[in-house]
Amino acid sequence: MNFQTTVVGYPRVGVGRPYKQALERFWSGKLDETGFRAAINELCHDRLATQAQRLDLVPVGDFSLYDHVLDTALMLGAVPARFGKVDAHNLQGYFALARGRDGLPALEMTKWFDTNYHYLVPEIPERWELQANLVLEQVRFAQNVVGAKARPVLLGPWTFLRLARLAGAELAQHLQQLTAMYAQIVRELNDCNVAFIQCDEPALVGDVTEEEWQAFAACYRELSKHGKIVVQTYYGDVTPWYRELCRLPIHGLGLDLVQGHANWAAIQYHGFPQDKILVAGVVNGRNVWRSDLADLYTKITGLSEFVAPERLILSSSCSLLHLPETVTAERNLPVAVSSGLAFAQERLAELELLANALRDGIASVQPTWDAALASRQQWLDGVGRIVPAVRERTAALGTETPARLAYAERVPLQQAKLNLPLLPTTTIGSFPQTAALRKARAEAKRNPTGYAETINAEIAHVIALQEQWGIDVLVHGEPERNDMVQFFAEHLAGYVATQEGWVQSYGSRCVRPPVIAGDVYRTAALSVAETAYAQSLTKRPVKGMLTGPVTMLQWSFVRDDLPRSAVAAQIGLALRDEVTDLEAAGINIIQIDEPAFREGLPLRRNDWQNYLDWAVRAFRIATSDAKPSTQIHTHMCYSDFNDIIAAIAALDADVISIEDARSAGSLLAGLEGRYTQQIGPGVYDIHSPNIPTVEQLVARMRQLLNYLPAEQLWINPDCGLKTRTYAEVAAALQAMVTATKQVRNQIS
């Protein structure tokens, strides 16, 4: 039996983050365009070669200088009129779309399905026009590196329009126009003698109407005339449309067999067409735990009843974009944990090992096979994976969702203690992380006293600046934190932190998701010392800053041997202990950030309620012991909350800040009259280097007051300030305070 191997996509970042370094050096002017393109070409060469060592077929077109959705939009001429004509190869124009320029707002950014990757939302043009076949250019480059192994990847036209927030008849109308353009792209790629053309259509695993399906089917009936199309799905199953997909005249179908458990059953129940290839996503592209190879061997062998081996390609469940590059870059992980991990390069090795075992028998690869199984078992047998005291404490919670005193009764108690003005100003939490700060953190273990002095000096600096600017509710700036999840993970038992486990969040922004390897609990205070020190420097209230249980879960690689709801409850209890200690230290406002709350939603609405129930419960486990006079804040990112407003209200936070600056108030229009707690929608976009003017901020505040009474509105940036410079922060926050004073005067 001859099984081929591939993956849906591969990480862009590289070991040591050469991707990030090249981008940021180019943006800062330290690298010219020639040098930048040379650095990117070297990175692309290396990632192609790495894949070709293990795989039979290498995806090409998944790489991007910022975001693959943006690349597709530019290729199709979907450039907002405010930017004028942008040539597909013009780097300045390309990055202006992503980051804004000269007062022009960037494209809106939001979460890519239910992941922590961000994409730029396409704006529909008046007229579609194919600018350049950018994937064809990547294929020609790749064929010089890996030869016939190169196969192209396109973001499918139907999912592209769904990502642009089109639906129903409007989607069908635009899809007709795009189909002709995609047909040309497919023809040109097919002429390169590629094995097949992967068209990513992950939106099929969400809710799809009959009208939308008909538009999809018509598109692919046409595209299949022009090349060998494999419709690639991921992040779930396609069971509602499985039989219809099998009837399409496409070359093959890519299915997620990890998250999409029901896809296995669909194949077994309905069979699989003998004229198509199956790209079977059998290794996890989203989580880092080693595959259970023995189980996969049995399952894949069973697939041979339905799919001949020559038509079966072993692959990842989704793009490996969500994984770090390699476990071999880690030097300090406990062996009991590292033995159970598989990052992107290890996933390639798993696929190669599986294919060899299936082709020649396990005996042919016995030593490697046995070592892989033993490594996984070493983690399962590890100390700390199960902690009886933690299991007992979570069991004692029962099944009820804990509650505080009613919001209406808490408000006067909080105002009496805090005495805040109308339209109180604050920031979301983080302040710029300077080079000196990063250097001090890197040297912390060698010089802990010097590090503590640096942190306290930075906190004092941040407090003094905020007082100087006239901010009402202060933050300590989080100088001790490398990342809002990573910091807490490094101080909670059950978590382990990687050194080189970087994954792309958006553009050059990379994060290191920690790994939840065992039961989670707090062994000591997490943030009390820094917050209490900040409060000692000012009479204004300082917010305690914590990361909520759902975000701690969503932005981590979570153990796969315990339900996510159970892990979230464990984190909630650890945070409850921290809230109690912050109150005891005199902190009267505590913010528990949940920027990832919405991204945890399953992609089909029928599955939402179960998630929302346990997510709300985990948050309230963390907050329910807080005093009524303690004001609980939360913060959420890039989200459309209108359809989950009941769950947001059920969190029972006193104040919520949301990332709405790029959405022109559309979110608030849906919340009008449906949410009674206080809201800070974000008055400017921190992801853009553009500095808002006082006039722009006044206009934004007036817009917000069309939807919210002044008593309900808070004034703040739309996210943390960690990625900005102090010069940018000073200019923006001073303008924000000035604008707030003007609006207050107008109201009074």
From Swiss-Prot:
Task: List the SUPFAM superfamilies hit by this protein, alphabetically.
Answer: UROD/MetE-like (SSF51726)
Binding residues for L-methionine, per the UniProt record? I428, G429, S430, E478, D593
According to the UniProt entry, what is the EC number of this protein?
2.1.1.14
Q: Which InterPro entries match?
A: Cbl-indep_Met_Synth_N, Cobalamin-indep_Met_synthase, Met_Synth_C/arc, UROD/MetE-like_sf
GO biological process terms, semicolon-separated:
methionine biosynthetic process; methylation
- Is the keyword Methyltransferase assigned to this protein? yes
Q: Where does Zn(2+) bind?
A: H635, C637, E659, C719
Annotated catalytic residues: H687
Which residues are noted in the entry as 5-methyltetrahydropteroyltri-L-glutamate-binding? K111, R509, C510, W555, E599
Q: How is the cofactor bound?
A: Binds 1 zinc ion per subunit.
Pathway annotation: Amino-acid biosynthesis; L-methionine biosynthesis via de novo pathway; L-methionine from L-homocysteine (MetE route): step 1/1
Q: Which residues bind L-homocysteine?
A: I428, G429, S430, E478, D593
Q: Which PANTHER family match?
A: 5-METHYLTETRAHYDROPTEROYLTRIGLUTAMATE--HOMOCYSTEINE METHYLTRANSFERASE
Regarding protein family, the annotation reads:
Belongs to the vitamin-B12 independent methionine synthase family.
User: What is the protein name stated in its UniProt record?
Assistant: 5-methyltetrahydropteroyltriglutamate--homocysteine methyltransferase
Q: Which organism is it from?
A: Herpetosiphon aurantiacus (strain ATCC 23779 / DSM 785 / 114-95)
